[in-house]
Swiss-Prot record:
Cofactor: [4Fe-4S] cluster
Record bears the keyword 4Fe-4S: yes
Quaternary organization: Heterodimer of LeuC and LeuD.
Superkingdom of the source species: Bacteria
Lineage: Bacteria, Pseudomonadati, Pseudomonadota, Alphaproteobacteria, Magnetococcales
Keywords assigned by UniProt, alphabetized: 4Fe-4S, Amino-acid biosynthesis, Branched-chain amino acid biosynthesis, Iron, Iron-sulfur, Leucine biosynthesis, Lyase, Metal-binding
GO-annotated molecular function: 3-isopropylmalate dehydratase activity; 4 iron, 4 sulfur cluster binding; metal ion binding
Enzyme category, top tier: lyase
Task of the protein: Catalyzes the isomerization between 2-isopropylmalate and 3-isopropylmalate, via the formation of 2-isopropylmaleate.
Pfam family, one: Aconitase
Name recorded for this polypeptide: 3-isopropylmalate dehydratase large subunit
């Protein structure tokens, strides 16, 4: 058999058939569901008189609309409450496992699933959510789907897809001190652009990726969609297997040994052809800060806001000018002179225990700047929150002046109580800096947890490499 990429191995193992027009039917191993994109899908099943074909393969959690404080008073927004309540009733009616509000396992869907061992190597995984690529960190093929596709997977445990192309992104060399997985993926997007991965599944490789922890790899894969890609993935190694072992939904006993033997084959074969290859030097990756309204509009923290007049492409130049106007920034401004109003540490990109530890190191023994209106830390799940509290991280944050919240998607997107006011500027560890993403006329700068924490202390962005 000819050499295969990791993607091809998983795709071929799940391929049921390919039609004449090139559309393929593939089997789906795991389906993740949340409250926003699932109600219409369940209603479609009811109208058609269908059951969920494999309820044991679907797992649900409310996250987008869940408030992160004052939970005792319940969900006050009627639409949010309806969506959360509807998810619970649908899961009960169709026999689906749900980790509801009050369950320690509840939290952001893309933090919960790896934590529970639901995300496993070699699996196909889908969710009605853009950032499903997160689970590709496990050597899985994971991607977001639309609501009609959610219904299709619930009804059939299969999905119609066009086979994407493959791109290998090799990040070689040692990452400098102060730079993180978040900086790697922002740097990649800054290089290839938000359309650079369109039509591709990205495989992240090279020594810098191999050196990352599993949580770091999840951060990188999480933002593959922001490069326009269908999915992102990392080959299985000993770190992958060690992370999965012993988790609630991971295989046990003989099944574990059999699974590990198969998982160890989940890497691209020597000489396997990719449709595109990008090679980057990790030594060039400084801490990154986005300055515009797209993740590709990013600069090193020791750099300046770029000047659109230096951009030869007219379309890009126009986009840069529009972004600067929206963000209220002047070309040539040093990144370290950009002051922020609020700081958000959380989201499916950066709310795991390692993220919180990194942020805590940056704030320990210090105080949030008087100019900061709000600095909040939102753990990814109740279990992450519990572990952080056992390690005393909550006290470090609260003594510094941060708010320590309950799990949820929170300020990543304006779908709950945690929103920016018009014109407010936020240092955010989330994944999207689009216009209005964190609230009407909000201004979002994407950074790593340590960079966000340091900005809260200083009141503006700082180069964390300078101590």
């Amino acid at each position: 058999m000819s050499a295969q990429t990791l993607f091809e191995k998983i795709w071929n193992a799940h391929l049921i058939r390919t039609d004449e027009d090139g559309t393929s039917l593939i089997y789906i191993d795991r389906h993740l569901v949340h409250e926003v994109t699932s109600p219409q899908a369940f209603e479609g099943l009811r109208l058609a008189g269908r059951k969920v074909r494999h309820p044991e393969a679907t797992f649900a959690v409310p996250d987008h609309n869940v408030p992160t404080k004052d939970l005792a008073g319940g969900i006050k927004d009627p639409v949010s409450k309806l969506q959360v309540d509807t998810l619970a009733s649908n899961c009960q009616a169709f026999g689906i496992t749900e980790f509801g509000v009050g369950d320690l396992r509840q939290g952001v869907v893309h933090v919960m699933a790896p934590e529970q061992g639901i995300s496993l190597p070699g699996f196909t995984m889908v969710c009605g959510d853009s950032h499903t690529a997160t689970h590709g960190a496990f050597g899985a093929l994971a991607f977001g789907i639309g609501t009609s596709e959610v219904e299709h997977v619930l009804a059939t445990q299969t999905l119609m897809q066009k086979k994407p192309k493959t791109m290998l992104i090799q990040v070689e060399g040692e990452l400098p001190a102060g730079s993180t997985a978040k900086d790697i993926i922002l740097y990649i997007i800054g290089n290839i652009g938000t359309a650079g991965g369109t039509g591709y599944v990205l495989e992240f490789g090279g020594s810098a990726i191999q050196a990352l922890s599993m949580e770091g790899r999840m951060t990188v894969c999480n933002m593959a969609i922001e490069a326009g890609a269908r999915a992102g993935m990392v080959a299985v190694d000993e770190k992958t297997i060690a992370y999965v072992q012993g988790r609630p939904y991971a295989p046990k006993g003989e099944a574990w040994e059999k699974a590990v033997a198969q998982w160890q084959t989940l890497k691209s074969d020597e000489g396997a052809p990719f449709d595109a290859v990008v090679t980057l030097d990790a030594r060039n990756i400084a801490p990154q800060v986005t300055w515009g309204t797209s993740p590709e509009l990013v600069a090193p923290v020791d750099g300046c806001v770029p000047n659109p007049t230096d951009e030869p492409n007219g379309v890009k130049r126009g986009a840069m000018e529009k972004a600067l106007a929206y963000m209220g920034l002047q070309a040539g401004t040093p990144m370290t002179e950009i002051a922020v109003d609020k700081v958000f540490i959380g989201s499916c990109t950066n709310s795991r225990i390692e993220d919180l530890r990194a942020a805590a190191v940056a704030v320990a023994g210090k105080k949030v700047a008087a100019s900061i209106k709000l600095a909040l830390v939102v753990p990814g799940t109740g279990l992450v929150k519990q572990q952080a509290e056992q390690e005393g991280l909550d006290k470090i944050f609260m003594e510094a002046g941060f708010e320590w919240r309950e799990p949820g998607c929170s300020m990543c997107l304006a779908m709950n109580n945690d929103v920016l006011e018009p014109g407010e500027r936020c240092a955010s560890t989330s994944n999207r800096n689009f216009e209005g993403r964190q609230g009407k006329d909000s201004r979002t700068h994407l950074v790593s947890p340590a960079m966000a924490a340091a900005a809260a202390i200083a009141g503006h962005f700082v180069d964390i490499r300078n101590g």
